[in-house]
From Swiss-Prot:
It comes from the Eukaryota. Expressed in stems, leaves, flowers and siliques. Residues 1-21 form the signal peptide. This is Probable inactive purple acid phosphatase 16. Fe cation binds at residue 303. The gene is PAP16. Its cofactor is Fe cation; Zn(2+). It comes from Arabidopsis thaliana. Homodimer. Substrate binds at residues 301-303.
Length: 367
């Protein structure tokens, strides 16, 4: 009997049931086409739902995503955290707003994955003026919410993913971490297979929960050890390119950040604020910089930054683009796009704006 190859073993390992008890298949490149990913960052659905302004922001955010999806027709979508602003959602089931944020992608039959930001499970913050003579305004709950669900209680990270998976029509690739990594929840890896079954995988996509909200903004030592074990098992010879996604930038982003203007080798269009990094560094960047297979890290969190800069001449550190009309800042909205080509292997990225324009294209593959 012929022994399976290393790549066949990797595919088998990544097809085992996840913590949620379901089996998630692998992604696959379409024959003759590159594999394209759209990143939606910082949508911040559910803000000020007791006003006319808040729901209007969500409509605008849907329009941004729809414009990007129709222009780029991606194979996959990554929701890069702060999908909702839970500290502004005055109902128990924040997943109803999470579902609204996912809907443009799901309605087009495009698979996706999500990870958490610092606002997704934050506790509800009571506006002080509600406790004055004006009183608490009537809550505007989504139609799917009953009276019991229209209360002042948050929704946990685990509950959000569980509800997402239930309503995903099998399009969600999101997973729940092993419990030993909790309270960090969105830690998992996805494999992008070649269109040719006889060829090795094209890429490994790692998703990490950078915390915030219900616990500190940090990638823990336990997560670092999980990544080391997972990556060394799946990619021991560093032959498969790896891309990393999390929400809050690491401190390494501060080291490469442009001082004022974005100049080469960095590429981007806005540099309007300082990098707001994780609270502590527990060795994740040291692990990544020592893996030649890691090509780039993608984060959100800072709405006024959209650049990519090389780090130690080994990998790229990239911000996405603020996609949602929720959250701070009035910079034009858009989405970072990734394109992975097989033959020859190449990773390109650019930013697609709501108005249809494209800018800041850069090759993330070192020759």
């Amino acid at each position: 009997m012929k022994k399976p190859s290393l790549f066949q073993i990797i595919i088998i390992v990544l097809s085992i049931p996840t913590t949620t008890g379901r089996t998630v298949g692998n992604l696959r490149v379409r024959e003759g086409s590159p594999f394209k990913i759209a990143i939606f960052a910082d949508l911040h659905f559910g803000e000020d739902t007791w006003t006319d302004w808040g729901p209007g922001q969500d409509v605008n955010s849907v329009n941004v995503m729809s414009a990007v999806l129709d222009a780029e027709t991606p194979d996959f979508v990554v929701y890069l955290g702060d999908v909702v602003t839970a500290n502004n959602i005055a109902i128990q089931n924040a997943s109803l707003f999470w579902d609204k944020a996912i809907s443009p992608t799901r309605d087009r039959g495009i698979p996706w994955a999500t990870l958490f930001g610092n606002h997704d499970d934050a506790s509800f913050v009571w506006p002080l003026d509600w406790l004055s003579s004006s009183g608490i305004p009537p809550l505007r709950c989504p139609a799917a919410s009953d009276d019991d669900g229209c209360t002042f209680r948050g929704t946990t990270r685990v509950e959000l993913i569980q509800e997402e998976i239930k309503s995903s029509n099998a399009l969600s690739y999101s997973m729940i971490s092993p419990k030993e990594l909790w309270p960090s929840v969105s830690n998992y890896v996805l494999l992008v297979e070649s269109s040719d079954h006889s060829k090795p995988p094209v890429a490994l996509l790692y998703f990490l929960d950078s915390g915030g909200g219900s616990y500190p903004e940090v990638i823990s030592n336990a997560q670092v050890e999980w990544f080391k074990t997972k990556s060394n098992t799946l990619n021991p010879y560093l032959r498969i390119p790896e891309l990393i996604f999390w929400h809050i930038p690491s401190k390494a982003y501060k080291k490469v950040a442009p001082r004022l203007w974005i100049t080469k080798p960095c590429v981007g269009s806005i540099n309007k604020e300082k990098v707001v990094a994780q609270e502590a560094e527990n060795g994740m960047m040291r692990v990544l910089e020592n893996r030649s297979s890691v090509k780039a890290v993608f984060v959100g969190h800072n709405h006024g930054l959209d650049w990519c800069c090389p780090y130690k001449d080994k990998l790229w550190l990239c911000f996405a683009r603020h996609t949602g009309y929720g959250g701070y800042g009035n910079w034009p909205r858009g989405s970072r796009i990734l394109e992975i080509s097989e033959m020859p292997f190449r990773i390109k990225t650019w930013i697609r704006m709501e108005d249809g324009s494209v800018h800041s294209e850069v090759n993330l593959t070192y020759d």
